[in-house]
């Protein structure tokens, strides 16, 4: 097991305050932040699991083409929808599962319409998800976990409890799971619970890593950790003590491997 990763983290409370500051004095809209976050997720997928290229992992070689995007009801889910749109344009074949949608929310309705215009298919039941992943000839090569973000508070409720439980129990035969900001079901500050535990292969921390990211990288020797969401100005970075992490970006990078 590797040593604790030397990077600054933001608690759930601090991450919430930072987001609020970005959207008040920072004058960012939620659309902008979601677009930048989703782009970072897509770029992480492209860099770590390139399309139509064999990638060596500890288990096998695979051609990462079809991507299953698991979409939650909040902003984390919106990041996943944005990522799916980019991946479709980059020669991946995303499929989304979006079982619980915000009522009458134009932002999410627009994101769904954009995916429909790109002919991105959608699964409507957990049975379909299980059938797709359990099938011997399943073509799914990557699972994007964009169910819950840093504002998640336990317990996990349906329609996500059975889904997350399935992912945790069947980890050994599932394709790599890439979690957005936190592995869904984990406590943002304390890490995995005792009942349900998604074992992600890759984590993309947005804005700055959360405390559970250190537990993630220390949970196995082959864990992959990226930082994305390059929209923090120097004043906010200093205020929250994350100058070092923000300064890891070089040139025109929108993501950086930690």
UniProtKB/Swiss-Prot annotation:
Record flagged with keyword Zinc-finger: no
Positions contributing to (6S)-NADPHX binding: 75-79, 149-155, 181
Cellular component, GO annotation: mitochondrion
NCBIfam families assigned: yjeF_nterm
Name this protein carries in UniProt: NAD(P)H-hydrate epimerase
InterPro entries registered for this protein in UniProt: YjeF_N_dom (IPR004443), YjeF_N_dom_sf (IPR036652), YJEFN_prot_NAXE-like (IPR032976)
Cofactor-binding details, from the entry: Binds 1 potassium ion per subunit.
EC number annotated for this UniProt entry: 5.1.99.6
GO molecular function: metal ion binding; NAD(P)HX epimerase activity; nucleotide binding
Keyword field: Cytoplasm, Isomerase, Metal-binding, Mitochondrion, NAD, NADP, Nucleotide-binding, Potassium
Species this protein is from: Candida albicans (strain SC5314 / ATCC MYA-2876)
Location in the cell: Cytoplasm; Mitochondrion
Cofactor: K(+)
Gene3D superfamilies: YjeF N-terminal domain (3.40.50.10260)
Catalytic activity: (6R)-NADHX = (6S)-NADHX; (6R)-NADPHX = (6S)-NADPHX
Main localization category: cytoplasm
Function, in words: Catalyzes the epimerization of the S- and R-forms of NAD(P)HX, a damaged form of NAD(P)H that is a result of enzymatic or heat-dependent hydration. This is a prerequisite for the S-specific NAD(P)H-hydrate dehydratase to allow the repair of both epimers of NAD(P)HX.
Limits of the YjeF N-terminal domain: 15-244
Enzyme class: isomerase
Similarity-based family: Belongs to the NnrE/AIBP family.
Residues reported to bind K(+): 76, 145, 184
